[in-house]
UniProtKB/Swiss-Prot annotation:
This is tRNA (cytidine(56)-2'-O)-methyltransferase. Pfam families: Trm56. GO terms for cellular component: cytoplasm. Belongs to the aTrm56 family. GO terms for molecular function: tRNA (cytidine(56)-2'-O)-methyltransferase activity. GO terms for biological process: tRNA nucleoside ribose methylation. NCBIfam families: PRK03958.1.
Length: 179
């Protein structure tokens, strides 16, 4: 299963920080790719620097034609839209997990009001709670439930920096630089 996250409606300066956090959360919790619908060099460079230092094969892509992308994706996988107005995550997650054994997943996370068409294109509109909160929180909870907590402490290939969980303080492993 490949998991991609579509960040729909990134609004330049207004969303720089939160969109960066959406991308980093996607990477850290198991997604393989983030797709933005608008270009933002600052966010893209921030994400690429994290991947370079912390490892993994996470991809950052810009796709301006999101409707076409969703329709094409549906040929090989399922589309999950995270929203306050969808099916309860606790009730629908077992079904999504079962289907995802054989199919890829595109998770849609909106930045602004999401067009009605997204609700119609999605195979699943999933609510992560019924109170206003952050799309970063919704994505984190969804990915953690999808992977059943297994991605929280995984090792990333080619990592130059690794954190080792420790109850006694910071344990940081850094790749030695060849001089």
């Amino acid at each position: 299963m490949v998991v991609e996250v579509l960040r729909l409606g990134h609004r330049g300066d207004r969303d720089k920080r939160i969109s960066t956090h959406v991308a980093l959360t996607a990477r850290a919790l198991g997604a393989d790719k983030i797709i933005f619908t608008t270009e933002d060099e600052h966010v893209e460079n921030s994400v690429k620097k994290v991947v370079e230092s912390w490892g993994g094969n996470f991809e950052f892509v810009v796709e301006k034609h999101w409707r076409k992308y969703i329709r094409e994706f549906k040929k090989r996988g399922i589309v999950v839209h995270l929203t306050m107005y969808g099916a309860n995550i606790n009730e629908i997650m077992p079904e999504i997990r079962e289907i995802s054994r054989d199919k890829d997943i595109l998770v849609i996370v909106g930045a602004e009001k999401v067009p009605k068409e997204v609700y119609e294109l999605a195979d699943y509109n999933v609510s992560v709670g019924n109170q206003p909160h952050s799309e970063v929180a919704a994505l984190a909870i969804f990915l953690d439930r999808l992977f059943e907590g297994k991605t929280l402490y995984r090792d990333f290939e080619d990592a130059k920096i690794k954190i080792v969980p420790s109850k006694d303080g910071k344990v940081v492993i850094r790749e030695k630089q060849n001089k």
